[in-house]
Structure formats: C-alpha cells, structure tokens
C-alpha cells in the first residue's frame, strides 16, 4: 500500500518490481539553490516534472550551467507542452528564451495546485517525456530540440511550433 508513500520512493519501488536488477537512487528533498548543483552535475539528463515556475527556472539555469540536457513538460487543466533543451545543440533555446518571465511573474503563472490538471493530460506529457528521454539517451530519432509541442486535450490535437534561442537571454544568451 503506497498511498501515503513519497512519490519518488513509490516510483522506485514500482521500478524495482518491474526489474529487480536495476539500481534506483531517489532524492526526496526539495530542489533548491543549495542542492541544485550537486543534484544536476552527476546526471546525463534531467526530466522536469516540477509544478511551479520558480523551480522550473532554477532547473533550467542549473542544467544549462552544467551542460545537462533538460526535458521540459508542463500540464495545466487539459493542456500540455513539451520540448527538449540541449545546451550543446546550436538550435536549442532554454526555458527562459521561450518563457521570459521574471521573478515577479512567478505568482501569476498558473500552477496545477491552483488551476487543476486532468490526470490524462499528465499521463500524456509523461509518456512524451519518456520518449524524448529515450531518444536523447540513445541518440536515435529526432528529439524536440528547437520545437515546442503543444497538446490541447479538449480537441485531442497537437501543434508544433519552432522556438529559438534569444541572444539576449540571461541564462543562455550572450547578453
């Protein structure tokens, strides 16, 4: 019974039940300025499943500093979006290039806890993140680099838009 269990520990337990030979390491604390460098530096890839803007921007900045690819996905209500940020890829922007919010805007960005989210929307976004992770880690297929995939759950439609780096971006630009 995992109802009261931490979701990272629950996911680890489930993963081990599927494959008892794998090693799973969980981090159950909050991602913050104090631990961000240590958490990101030793990884080949980060999959962002956060639910607030402030943490997303921190994950983006730290991943860019450490040159670690980041798979960003978000879901609010019935809508979702996903893209990959790969610091070494010429065509790759970062999160702040696409969503140039400032710290003052954090409270204005909709979050799942305030706006709600349909469970199937998070399931779809998670499945797409998994596919992108496999493509990046195995270097197969065409990852969503320089492309933002939008999902509209009410019409069951996907829209892809091109996104590019902002030369004035405070995270990845030259400005």
What are these language model-derived features?
Residues 1-175:
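Adenine nucleotide-associated cytosolic modules
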